[in-house]
């Protein structure tokens, strides 16, 4: 009989091993066997929990997305209630420590690439894109007319993605302070233009 709670412990262990494997070997070098080896368990156990490599990547990205959504919620709740503060909180969540470690950044890059070929991953990416746009639009709509709020949300989402992508591809630790300053300046510009 399995130990109570072992399933979640094992899944977390395997997701961590997947993040490390993608960090060290990339997605092509990440296999059920490489993940099992990093987790010190059998390949059969990885198969039991995730089925195949696609299932493992999907579960890993769901974990990363939950971390992003938790950081977004936590920062929005802690922010002052004005749109500027809440927009800054959303931006900061995208550059949260849970999103900018080397293993997570490389996993995001692998996920984006693979989502163009896998329907489930494409759906996850679509949900994430819509959620970001919706959150930004809701805050901009408190200060701007509806059409301008939508346009501002699209622009800020593109800026977040662009700053994050440039940081991920820079080859070293991401300069979150510089990224946040650029995004904050953009928010200030948009809110001042109304």
UniProtKB/Swiss-Prot annotation:
Pathway: Amine and polyamine biosynthesis; betaine biosynthesis via choline pathway [regulation]. Residues 31-50 bind DNA. Residues 8-68 form the HTH tetR-type domain. PROSITE patterns: HTH_TETR_1, HTH_TETR_2. GO terms for biological process: glycine betaine biosynthetic process from choline; negative regulation of DNA-templated transcription. It comes from the Bacteria. GO terms for molecular function: DNA-binding transcription factor activity; transcription cis-regulatory region binding. Keywords: DNA-binding, Repressor, Transcription, Transcription regulation. Transmembrane segments: none annotated. Pfam families: TetR_C_6, TetR_N. Repressor involved in the biosynthesis of the osmoprotectant glycine betaine. It represses transcription of the choline transporter BetT and the genes of BetAB involved in the synthesis of glycine betaine. This is HTH-type transcriptional regulator BetI. The lineage of its organism: Bacteria, Pseudomonadati, Pseudomonadota, Betaproteobacteria, Burkholderiales.
């Amino acid at each position: 009989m399995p130990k109570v709670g072992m399933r979640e412990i094992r899944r977390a262990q395997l997701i961590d091993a997947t993040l490390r494997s993608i960090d060290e070997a990339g997605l092509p070098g990440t296999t059920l066997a490489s993940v099992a080896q990093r987790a010190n368990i059998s390949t059969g156990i990885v198969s039991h929990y995730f089925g195949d490599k696609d299932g493992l990547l999907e579960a890993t990205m769901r974990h990363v997305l939950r971390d992003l959504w938790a950081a977004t919620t936590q920062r929005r709740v802690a922010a002052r209630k004005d749109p500027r503060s809440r927009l800054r909180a959303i931006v900061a969540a995208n550059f949260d420590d849970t999103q900018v470690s080397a293993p997570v950044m490389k996993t995001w890059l692998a996920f984006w690439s693979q989502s163009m070929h896998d329907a489930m991953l494409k759906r996850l990416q679509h949900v994430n894109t819509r959620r970001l746009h919706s959150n930004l639009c809701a805050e901009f709509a408190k200060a701007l007319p509806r059409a301008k709020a939508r346009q501002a949300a699209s622009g800020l989402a593109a800026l977040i993605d662009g700053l994050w992508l440039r940081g991920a591809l820079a080859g070293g630790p991401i300069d979150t302070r510089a990224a946040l300053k650029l995004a904050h300046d953009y928010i200030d510009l948009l809110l001042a233009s109304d």
